[in-house]
């Protein structure tokens, strides 16, 4: 951790046994945040503590995380190709978002707190409904198809292939656009309009 005013390191936090892939902060601004790692764990931290205050164990590398708007859930993506909504009060999986065919590389909650965008190494960007009472396939339901009733849209129009892997997706401040960076040095941008599918409207190259 660094002091943003002085640029000096404030604190070094230890606890993970593998590469740390992502960090997510709660929107409450209370100094609580979580970290995801290749060691298969998500650790929870308080800014005033040097050591984790809680953890979630998954047993496989976790690549991305994001808190729900009220911080009651943590969305977790990893190498199992799924996004799991973990209830932080019970530590149980509330539901899973199924559809990606490869590792989930990033998660981002809309500013309204109702939509989650995910990017994956399957060359897809997906938008999900994460409102509390949206329809969902239960995480443990036998024979459930590999998709989720919460999937709103799959955004298309980007390049595909190993050199074009999608790394990070984010919402614009007004939730009207979705942008995703790619390994081929390009930024793909979509105009997101509810109920009206749209392809990539432009691509920026660095």
Language-model region placement:
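WD40-repeat beta-propellers
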Residues: 1-3, 42-46, 83-87, 125-130, ...
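A short beta-strand motif characteristic of beta-propeller blades
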Residues: 8-13, 51-55, 92-97, 153-159, ...
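Short loop/turn segments immediately following beta-strands, especially the blade-tip
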Residues: 129-146, 191-195
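Loop/turn-rich, solvent-exposed surfaces of beta-rich toroidal or solenoidal domains
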Residues: 160-192
